[in-house]
Curated annotation (Swiss-Prot):
Subunit structure comment from the entry: Homohexamer.
Pathway: Pyrimidine metabolism; CTP biosynthesis via de novo pathway; UDP from UMP (UMPK route): step 1/1
Pfam families recorded: AA_kinase
A single GO molecular function term of this UniProt record: UMP kinase activity
Listed HAMAP family: PyrH_A
Protein name: Uridylate kinase
EC number: 2.7.4.22
Domain of life: Archaea
Organism: Methanococcus vannielii (strain ATCC 35089 / DSM 1224 / JCM 13029 / OCM 148 / SB)
PANTHER family: URIDYLATE KINASE, URIDYLATE KINASE PUMPKIN, CHLOROPLASTIC
Subcellular location: Cytoplasm
Documented activity regulation: Inhibited by UTP.
Gene Ontology BP, a term: UDP biosynthetic process
Gene assigned in the entry: pyrH
Amino acid sequence: MDIVFALGGSVLMPKDGASAENIKSYAQVFKKLKDMGHNVSIVVGGGNTAREYIKVSREFTNESVCDEIGIMATRMNAMLLISALSKYSVNFVPTNFKDAEMILNLGKILVMGGTHPAHTTDAVSATLAEFTNADLLVIATNVDGVYTKDPRTNNDAKKLEKMTTKELIEITGSNSISAGSSSVVDSLASKIIDRAKLKTIVVKGTPDEILKSVLGGHDGTIIIP
């Protein structure tokens, strides 16, 4: 199966900082899936690293430059994961899909970050899934699925176990597109998922849930075209 993972930067690089053991635990999951015969592509977010740099840079520059800074952070995070994957990947972070395709053609795990200003890594992962005709897109984030509202700030938020791409667009339509903004799935990604008719699963970004998103038994949200 061809699988694209959107790996949230905040789960790979949590607020308490970088941890070699944490990064290794994600690498082990992706290695296992590769050993099982799956083609694995990973788009890594910028997380707290990106947001801290963007917060500072916003004091003296515009959103487009902040976007570029955020993209650089995603690529640093991608390089960390590549290092942990060792021979399973290649020592290179592609910046476009043609280079990404070459890595997949080598039979390696593809790891990349952002590509264009104003595009989140969710949008990049959805576009990559469309480009590669992936069988599954997995969005691994800091909440355990899609909710009617942000569960971190709304006690009455209800989790959705299954939904359509059209329903996803309705929920995500008002999300911010400022540099460093974060939501479970952003509005552009939702539209690409709908356009490409991608089977998508949103899960809590733990190694165990990521594995279950492929093998079964996950506790996330299934999005169907």
